[in-house]
UniProtKB/Swiss-Prot annotation:
One BP annotation, GO: L-leucine biosynthetic process
EC number: 4.2.1.33
NCBIfam families attached to this UniProt entry: leuD, PRK01641.1
Name of this protein: 3-isopropylmalate dehydratase small subunit
InterPro entries, per the entry: 3-IsopropMal_deHydase_ssu, Aconitase/3IPM_dehydase_swvl, AconitaseA/IPMdHydase_ssu_swvl, IPMI_Swivel, LeuD
Pathway where it operates: Amino-acid biosynthesis; L-leucine biosynthesis; L-leucine from 3-methyl-2-oxobutanoate: step 2/4
Keywords, ordered alphabetically: Amino-acid biosynthesis, Branched-chain amino acid biosynthesis, Leucine biosynthesis, Lyase
GO CC list: 3-isopropylmalate dehydratase complex
Gene Ontology molecular function: 3-isopropylmalate dehydratase activity
Mitochondrion among keywords: no
């Protein structure tokens, strides 16, 4: 899993509440167990018209936001069914951070397992970030995970809270398997060293 240290890039605003996982990645894209290629289906019911053409009004189709790395979204993002394809689709599109006032618990946990930083902020701070993100190409946010800060385009800084375990895993690029290996590495090394001393074993 890619480490998350500092992320600098355009933030796309989505002033919509209760965006569920079916809107993030519709069910027709769930047939695969690969984590790649899902970016094309991200928000597809909003991104594309019935004839398959792009909806020019959707934020991620607008030139300023096509390469957004952060989403600033409405309350209760990621509600609905517990499909891990939702963070897979976000990551495949290039989204590394999502900021809201609240997330569905399962989606929130799945983000961390897939290298995406989900940040919870107050309604007042979210409104500031929406206003920053609505600047288009100038909507650059810098997220420093170690310092737990979000710096806006004018240099204003917001602080956010995060569980220390989740922070450690993201900073070090550890998913569940990586975390297990990281914790057990000394014991594994000791066992292998012991075996090396017993050439007859």
């Amino acid at each position: 899993m890619e480490k998350f240290t500092t992320l600098e890039g355009v933030a796309a605003p989505m002033r919509i509440i209760n965006i569920d996982t079916d809107r993030i990645i519709p069910k027709q894209y769930l047939k695969t167990i690969k984590r790649t290629g899902l970016g094309q289906g991200l928000f597809s019911e909003m991104r594309y018209n019935d004839d398959g053409s792009e909806n020019p009004d959707f934020v991620l189709n607008q030139p300023a936001y096509r390469h957004a790395k952060t989403l600033v979204v409405g309350d209760n993002f990621g509600c609905g069914s517990s499909r891990e394809h939702a963070p897979w689709a976000l990551a495949d599109f290039g989204i590394r951070c999502v900021i809201s006032t609240s997330f569905a618990d399962i989606f929130f946990n799945n983000c961390a397992k897939n290298g995406i930083l989900a940040i919870v902020v107050s309604p007042e701070d979210l409104e500031k970030l929406f206003q920053d993100a609505e600047r288009g190409a100038n909507a650059t946010l810098t997220i420093d995970l170690a310092a737990q800060t979000i710096k806006g385009p004018d240099g204003g800084t917001l602080h956010f809270d995060i569980d220390e375990g989740r922070k450690h895993n993201l900073l070090n690029g550890l998913d569940e398997i990586g975390l297990t290996l990281d914790q057990k590495a000394p014991a594994i090394d000791a066992y292998e060293a012991k075996l090396a001393q017993r050439e007859w074993a």
